[in-house]
Amino acid sequence: MTEINLILKNGKITTLDPQNPEVQAIAIADGKVVRTGTTDEVMKLATPTSKVVDLNGRRVIPGLNDSHLHIIRGGLNYNMELRWEGVPSVADALRLLKEQADNTPAPQWVRVVGGWTEFQFAEKRLPTLEEINKAAPDTPVFVLHLYASAMLNRAALDVLGFNKDTPDPPGGKIVRNEKGEPTGLLLATPSAMILYSTLGKAPKLPVEDQVNSTRHFMRELNRLGITSAIDAGGGGQNYPEDYDVIKQLHDQNQMTVRIAYNLFAQKAGQELDDYRRWTEMTFPGDGDELFRMNGAGENLTWSAGDFEDFYEPRPDLPEKMEGELEAIVEHLAEKKWPFRIHATYDESINRLLNVFERVNSKSHSQLDLLLTMPKLYLSVISNVLVRWVVVSRFSIVWHIKVRFS
């Protein structure tokens, strides 16, 4: 008989079996469920070496999969981030900001990176730059709000060297006062690159702290019920060097979230070069059950990025997008690499689908099982799209619902 490693008893255990949706106890051996039932039934399998956990009536669910997460990049920075989700007021948020600033050693910054909206606060507003500067006058602060804006305190502006001569980047705006000096407010108009690139200039943690940070991030995901995720890559997440920390944790058997990861093109104009290099270095499926290479994406070419800043008009993708994307998708198809791509608006998605169909029609390369949908089905999808988006863009959709009904 298989040695039982773990028994959970006296609980409310969700099985997802329609015939038997809830049980009291579960027995696990070698990472597999071998028995469910009443506590008395399952405890008959216990051995002197079995770990037995009394749930005392608590709920247990199967592990959740997050199909779109930036877990590898996020783990490298998690210990440096101040989280505002669930914070009830601007006053509380500023108090936490001050505490974090007082405990942040130079040259590190205080970073609030998403996960919140002004409508969660009792005041129903954003913190002001004056309030942020008062809470943290000396430690650099970066506060990201959705993919629409970021606030920098005066200390961060000084470290970055932002002044009246600093130009606005393409698709972004540095808000200025009457003297032309930056106020600290950055706007995506609609490109979020101004936000990403600014945050990317903040100091990184030493490698040993990145390891610790990634472990803490995975532990937090576990607390929320997440046991597996598809990593969508990310800007500034270079392969293979920025995967060293997660590979170290995998080699040391310290991963607590299963990860399938995608490779994200990094530099505009060099995306095809990235994929030509990577397709010679690795292949989808490389790895094991815990850590596996998954394919390309979510960025295949920067010219296809339509962002999701709903404060701004929908951007028109440049005419060169189709040619750039077609060359990349054709290469991926020839190499049998699955891919994913980030897209927000149906106008963009239609153009992307046209590229995929064109690649699929070529005799020398074919996308396996490529199916496209007639406009009738696309219109049906558009009617329920907000329900789909809520899965991976909850805070943004919630914000839209509250703000715009």
What feature does the model see in each segment?
Residues V42, W302, N354-K362:
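Conserved helix-loop functional segments at active or binding sites
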Residues L376-S405:
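Active-site-adjacent C-terminal substructures of enzyme catalytic domains
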Residues Y78-L82, Q366-D368, M373, V402-S405:
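Short beta-alpha connecting loops at secondary-structure transitions
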Residues L325-I328, F339, S348-L352, L367-M373, ...:
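Extended, hydrophobic alpha-helical segments in both membrane/secreted and soluble proteins
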Residues L263-E271, T372-I381:
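Short, conserved secondary-structure transition motifs
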Residues M1-T2, L371:
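Polar low-complexity intrinsically disordered regions
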Residues L249-Q252, T279-F291, S361-H364, L385-R387:
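Acidic (Asp/Glu)-rich catalytic clusters
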Residues E3-K9, T14, P18-G63, S67-R277, ...:
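Divalent metal-binding segments
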